């Protein structure tokens, strides 16, 4: 019985957030069916004294949650984007529009995933199983589109891993700013 349960957990995790290779037919779109159910938006102000408001977005898939200390627990996929740059006057929330992944701080851009001083930063995916990070995948190019409908935010991500594997996902729900 334990073996069957383990297979189900592994299958569910893979189904929740496994990227797919880019399709060979350029007229079709391959999508990933990551289902993100929780979001946390963080405001850092003009963190780098660069004239930009800096934000981060943390999305959790089904099966993940935060414990009382703020650590991620459970099994699933965590999409994290740090260093999202918005115009200086965007002090309440990220403005609607399309943001492009880049390696420099510019309005309506966010930093690509990278290792910096022994830590991962920028845009990346964490595959988590039983509250332990199993895999880190850096995102190296792509876009994020933000829209707002009443109290909900709509996030549409068209991102790529370092090996050019496409990762597409969406989030629709409340935008909790901290």
Where are these regions (language model features)?
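Short, hydrophobic/aromatic-rich segments at coil-to-beta transitions
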Residues: 54-55, 150-156
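Bacterial signal peptide processing site
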Residues: 18-21
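C-terminal motif of bacterial Sec signal peptides marking the signal peptidase cleavage site
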Residues: 13-16
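Edge beta-strand at a domain terminus
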Residues: 23-26, 83, 140-144, 156-178
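Surface-exposed helix/loop patches within compact recognition domains
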Residues: 48-145
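Post-signal peptide N-terminal segment of mature Sec-exported envelope proteins
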Residues: 25-43
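Positively charged n-region of N-terminal signal peptides that target proteins for export
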Residues: 1-4
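Sec-dependent N-terminal signal peptides
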Residues: 7-8
